[in-house]
């Protein structure tokens, strides 16, 4: 089956003018640049590198296509952004498509030591159970306070990944330089990395590069909106396919049931026919005896 890529089937998710208005094109000062970003730089202006937005449009579509496919398969994408201007955007966008996210400090080993992180999340769940089943009532005031503080800390750092029961299938990072530990862990485990990459960052360890301003909230918002829309559509497609599959299964069951009914009717007809034949045989036998 020939599959067209997502971004070819649909119009581009963004356009040059919208990205320009959102200041996606503003890079860092030329003296802070990373030469590996040269292919994505259009020019320099007043000592600042200007990103080629035509390339950004294409790269957003490529990332959107890949994320659409991941979401369609029912896999999880972990969003990471601990810088102030990106936190709220990431939390809002990731939550809208029921994806996990990290906006507080990245705990070393979040991916490479995932089993330990899961234990911490389970600890949080255990505390919640204690609170609900009345176990808390048997503790001293001091113990209650200690556990409550522990629960608060766990919620702050890990609450947004509480539903992540296995390693994510992809990582989406805002500011790959700031989140270099997360990128390194994903690289080590072979988890594909999607990232907004500014002119001062190294794109070499990023699988899906989106060249753009990773400091301005407007820039972060427009890029995130585009990729999250694609994820949402992937999830919608998955839901539709599941519903269709369930409908087909239900139809198959009904057909089998109907066939079984028809078979029973035939067996009934055969029994009646056999009884008539047997009656004739008996009648003939009686005549012969007479």
PLM features per residue range, with description:
Residues 1-13, 233-290:
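Intrinsically disordered, compositionally biased charged tails
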């Amino acid at each position: 089956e020939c599959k067209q890529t997502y971004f070819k089937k649909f119009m581009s998710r963004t356009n040059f003018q919208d990205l320009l208005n959102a200041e996606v094109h503003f890079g860092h000062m030329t003296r802070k640049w990373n030469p590996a970003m040269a292919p994505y730089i259009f020019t320099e202006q007043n000592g600042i590198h200007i990103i080629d937005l035509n390339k950004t449009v294409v790269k957003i579509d490529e990332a959107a296509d890949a994320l659409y496919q991941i979401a369609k398969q029912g896999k999880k994408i972990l969003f990471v952004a601990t810088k102030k201007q990106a936190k709220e955007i990431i939390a809002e966008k990731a939550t809208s498509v029921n994806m996990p996210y990290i906006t507080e400090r990245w705990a070393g080993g979040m991916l490479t030591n995932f089993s330990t992180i899961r234990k911490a999340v389970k600890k949080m769940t255990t505390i919640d159970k204690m609170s609900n089943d009345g176990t808390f009532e048997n503790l001293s005031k001091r113990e209650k306070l200690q556990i409550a503080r522990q629960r608060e800390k766990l919620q702050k750092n890990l609450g947004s990944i509480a539903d992540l029961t296995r390693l994510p299938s992809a990582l989406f990072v805002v500011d790959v330089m700031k989140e270099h530990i997360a990128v390194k862990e994903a690289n080590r485990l072979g988890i594909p990395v999607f990232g907004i990459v500014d002119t001062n960052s190294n794109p070499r360890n990023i699988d899906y590069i989106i060249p753009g301003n990773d400091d301005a909230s407007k820039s972060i918002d427009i890029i995130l909106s585009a990729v999250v829309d694609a994820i949402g559509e992937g999830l919608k497609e998955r839901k539709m396919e599941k519903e269709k599959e369930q409908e087909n299964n239900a139809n198959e069951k009904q057909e089998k049931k109907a066939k079984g009914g028809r078979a029973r009717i035939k067996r009934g007809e055969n029994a009646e026919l056999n009884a008539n034949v047997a009656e004739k045989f008996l009648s003939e036998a009686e005549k012969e005896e007479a």
